[in-house]
Design a protein with these regions (language model features):
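Helix-loop-helix "hairpin" substructures at the membrane interface of multi-pass membrane proteins
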Residues: 153-230
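Transmembrane alpha-helical segments in multi-pass inner-membrane proteins
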Residues: 208-293, 298
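Loop-to-helix entry region at the N-terminal start of transmembrane alpha-helices
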Residues: 35-39, 147-169, 285-289
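Alpha-helical transmembrane segments within multi-pass membrane transporters and channels
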Residues: 83-126, 260-264
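Extracellular/periplasmic helix-loop junction at the C-terminal end of a transmembrane helix
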Residues: 124-159, 180, 300-306
Length: 325
């Protein structure tokens, strides 16, 4: 009974997501600028959902997103362009390379008990190290990677939408699996999880590698979107921090909350950038930061907390005066 209800709920959420993606495409398909704009939103929604696995379920504040995405982008682009592998195979291998890198990094950190703020600082430092390593290999300027299997913005939107749906389904699979239960136990109280027999190192490492595989695979799409490989964009701690912020405001472990946060807040940020950046440089960042701070102060639990408040308000307004039915 419970399983059938969960399955029905998943189907309804999946249909809702597909309808939303289709409606966005129909609304903006005639305007290439706005089509690329919503493609960017869909892409970052997939990235935020990937972060939700390590940050939302496992409770690890990971700031290395762009590092794994950049490594996956380089590997998949070179395999596709220079060696001639099929783009899909290249994407998978790029994701695997990021997952292996995450495993090599995460194993010693979890083995020696690196956690909380020290884990966040370590992952941010990894992005800086990777940035400088790549600059030594390909130079300090933009590097053109000739990857254009996707010829139109319509195809690019379709590809990013498929990626988002797949990451959405993977989140649900993790959430309702034994892995998800263990990760949430680790998030709530790691010492208590260890006390009841959960191998916290193993499951945190597994969550890290799954997350790195997803963002590494998505790195190829990011190269296709912008056309160039910019080291300062692919290995940017600022983008990693913004993704973590979107995941936190979306609610740790909340799939729908992360989607709302990514679409809404990322959309607001991009709108402010395109509207105000030419007026006063940096004004859009100031306003965007003010929006994030306000959300954090008003509702520390993020989007789920706002949804609960709104639901409670609706129930209160429907109740007759004096509580008499």
């Amino acid at each position: 009974m419970l399983r059938s209800l969960r399955r029905r709920g998943l189907y309804l959420r999946l249909i809702g997501l597909v309808v939303l993606l289709a409606a966005m495409y129909i609304a903006f398909m005639t305007n290439k600028y706005y089509l690329l704009f919503i493609t960017n939103l869909v892409f970052f929604a997939a990235i935020v959902l990937a972060w939700n696995i390590i940050g939302g379920y496992a409770g690890q504040l990971d700031l290395g997103t762009t590092g794994y995405m950049g490594v996956g982008a380089i590997v998949s682009s070179i395999l596709s362009n220079n060696i001639g592998l099929h783009p899909l195979i290249s994407i998978i291998l790029g994701g695997l390379s990021s997952a292996l890198l995450a495993g090599a990094i995460g194993f010693p950190m979890f083995r020696f008990g690196v956690r909380e703020v020290w884990y966040a600082l370590s992952t941010a430092a990894i992005v800086v190290i990777l940035n400088n390593a790549v600059r030594l290999l390909i130079g300090p300027y933009e590097y053109y990677l000739r990857v254009r299997p996707i010829k139109t913005y319509d195809e690019l939107y379709l590809a990013t939408s498929i990626a988002l749906v797949l990451v959405f389904l993977l989140n649900h699979a993790v959430n309702n699996s034994r892995l998800g239960y263990y990760l949430k136990a680790i998030r709530e109280d790691e010492l208590a999880a260890e006390a009841i027999g959960v191998d916290t190192r193993r499951y945190k490492l597994l969550a890290l590698m799954i997350y790195a595989f997803i963002v590494g695979s998505l790195g190829y799409l990011y190269v296709v979107m912008i056309g160039y490989f910019y080291t300062y964009r692919f290995f940017d701690t600022g983008i990693s921090v913004s993704i973590a912020i979107l995941g936190i405001i979306g609610g740790l472990g909340s799939i729908e909350g992360c989607l709302v946060s990514a679409f809404l807040l990322r959309g607001v940020g991009e709108y402010l950038r395109t509207s105000l950046a030419h007026i006063i440089p940096g004004l859009h960042l100031l306003l965007y930061g003010a929006v994030l701070i306000t959300l954090g102060v008003v509702e520390p639990e993020g989007i789920p907390g706002i949804a609960r408040r709104f639901t409670t308000l609706l129930k209160t307004t429907k109740r007759p005066v004096g509580g008499v039915k």
